[in-house]
From Swiss-Prot:
Record keywords, A-Z: Cobalamin biosynthesis, Glutamine amidotransferase
Protein name, per record: Cobyric acid synthase
Function: Catalyzes amidations at positions B, D, E, and G on adenosylcobyrinic A,C-diamide. NH(2) groups are provided by glutamine, and one molecule of ATP is hydrogenolyzed for each amidation.
UniProt family annotation: Belongs to the CobB/CobQ family. CobQ subfamily.
GO BP, sorted A to Z: cobalamin biosynthetic process
Keyword Transcription applies: no
Signal peptide start and end residues: none
Record-annotated active site: C331 (nucleophile), H431
UniProt KW Zinc-finger keyword: no
GO molecular function, one term: catalytic activity
Length: 491
């Protein structure tokens, strides 16, 4: 069965987006395509229709391919928890926590078995598999236990593209150095080089490309220009780069950049709004006076809550809320807004009872059982009757202590979230809540009303359509500069 692989000289070379673009380009040719990443380390996750957890990047690639995301597309997901530990998600289910030095000893064999099983299933269901590597395939200290790079390519005998970020500088050294560190059987799989994030005129680069091809015997199959668009990111470090000021912005939203922030793809739809400026606020930053503050999800809610309190930002958020500011919490952020979080089993590695922000009269109990499911419900607030979709990824259950009529359910299922009658405090377990265009606009209009701004129209669709346009724009931008014909013809 035909398969391609994309590996990179470094992290952040653009593997995920180029893989997504290839998936869309093959789909346009009429093929049924599946993305694949054997092992991903990320805190942005997605829940499949079967209730399994995979990396959000593989879900994005599946949407690019026009297929439903499944757990086979990312059989191993590692979710860092700090202190060199990660939660291990195997075939969609969390199976434990492990230290970095223990991971390969405990999970290498079972992990490779899961990868092979997943590939076998994808081969049965699809015409093409487009595989993505992780980091670099030439990490000498890790190669013997690398599950997700050229071991996969060798298993599939997949021709492989070696991608380099030319914007960082040193791209020729990166490519030659990577090749030199590969074993001969690995090197034979590299069928083309791709330069990514190029700024400038290709003719000024041509002499270097000619030298590279002559030196290695491997063709340069792509020089892809810098694409100045906002695409989903897997690394919270990239949030530091999202500092563009919008001249037409009328509303500012401060998202707290927790040390272990998770699922920050929740805010892509907000960033797509021309009238909204999203500002990511670190623990040492000033909160300022935004129109709303959002507490996002976290992989280690208790540790992030303690860091938030130690930094003084927790008190700043309480003061902001007391002055009538709008605060919205998603998942772990929702849990933080309550009275207490109780983790009597040490689910996150710390046992005990912990003070929340006391914005909601709620208690949250952590248990080993993890809630993973897609949800469909109907909104009650800020606009009743809106159909809502999203997904839950959380450990712990939250209960409202008070029978006070001051707090109301946001959705038909009261367990999914609540708000106060004034519309100042909001909390929900639903990831993807802002993907619901009408609900997003209704919530933004509540902020705009306070500033005396005209309401935005709410008759807009789901963010899925906008995301699909974004994928098309990505693929259109890549297609003229990436020559896949030699690989496709050979296969």
């Amino acid at each position: 069965m035909p398969a391609l692989m994309v590996v990179g000289c470094t992290s952040h070379a653009g593997k995920s987006l180029i893989t997504a673009a290839i998936c869309r380009l093959l789909r346009r040719q009429g093929w049924r395509v599946a993305p694949f990443k054997g092992q991903n380390m990320a805190l942005n996750a997605y829940v499949t229709a079967s209730g399994g957890e995979i990396g959000y990047a593989q879900a994005f690639q599946a949407w690019a391919a026009g297929v439903e995301p499944t757990i086979e597309m990312n059989p191993i997901l590692l979710k860092p928890q700090g202190d060199m530990t990660s939660q291990v998600v195997l075939k969609g289910r969390a199976v434990g926590r492990t230290l970095a030095e223990r991971y390969y000893q405990d999970y290498f064999e079972v992990g490779w078995e899961a990868i092979c099983e997943a590939l076998e299933q994808l081969q049965a269901d699809y015409d093409w598999i487009v595989c993505e590597g992780a980091g670099s395939p030439a990490e000498i200290n890790l190669k013997h236990r690398d599950l997700t790079n050229l071991r996969v390519a060798k298993h599939l005998q997949a021709p492989t593209l070696l991608l380099v970020d030319i914007d960082r500088g040193g791209s020729f050294a990166h490519l030659i150095g990577t090749l030199e560190l590969l074993d001969p059987d690995e090197r034979s799989l590299i069928r083309g080089f791709v330069f990514n994030k190029f700024r400038g005129r290709r003719e000024l680069l041509q002499s270097g490309l000619d030298w590279l091809e002559e030196r290695t015997g491997i063709p340069v199959l792509g020089v892809i220009p810098w694409i100045d668009r906002a695409f989903p990111s897997e690394d919270s470090l990239d949030l530091m780069e999202r500092r563009r000021r919008k001249t037409q912005a009328e509303v500012t939203i401060a998202v707290i950049r927790l040390p272990r922030i998770a699922n920050f793809t929740d805010f892509d739809p907000l960033e797509s709004e021309p009238s909204v400026q999203v500002r990511y606020v670190g623990l040492q930053d000033e909160l300022g006076y935004p129109d709303a503050v959002i507490l996002p999800g976290s992989k280690t809610t208790i540790s992030d809550l303690l860091d938030l309190q130690r930094s003084g930002l927790a008190q700043a958020i309480r003061d902001y809320a007391a002055a009538g500011g709008t605060v919205l919490g998603i998942c772990g952020g929702f849990q933080m807004m309550g009275q207490h979080i109780l983790d009597l089993e040490g689910t996150e590695g710390i046992e005990g009872q912990f003070e929340g922000l006391h914005l909601f009269p709620t208690q949250t109990w952590f248990t080993a059982e993890k809630t993973l499911r897609q949800r469909q419900t109907t909104a009650r607030s800020p606009q009743a009757g809106l159909p809502i979709t999203g997904y839950e990824i959380h450990q712990g259950q939250t209960r409202l202590d008070s029978d006070s009529e001051e707090f109301l359910p946001i959705f038909d299922d009261p367990k999914l979230g609540l708000c106060d009658r004034n519309g100042n405090l909001w909390g929900t377990y639903l990831h993807g809540i802002f993907d619901n265009g009408a609900w997003r606009r209704a919530w933004l209009n509540s902020l705009r009303h306070r500033r005396g701004l005209k309401a935005l129209p709410t008759s807009i669709g789901h963010y899925q359509a906008q995301r699909d346009d974004l994928i098309d724009a990505l693929s259109d931008a890549v297609e003229p500069y990436l020559n896949l014909s030699p690989l496709l013809t050979a296969l």
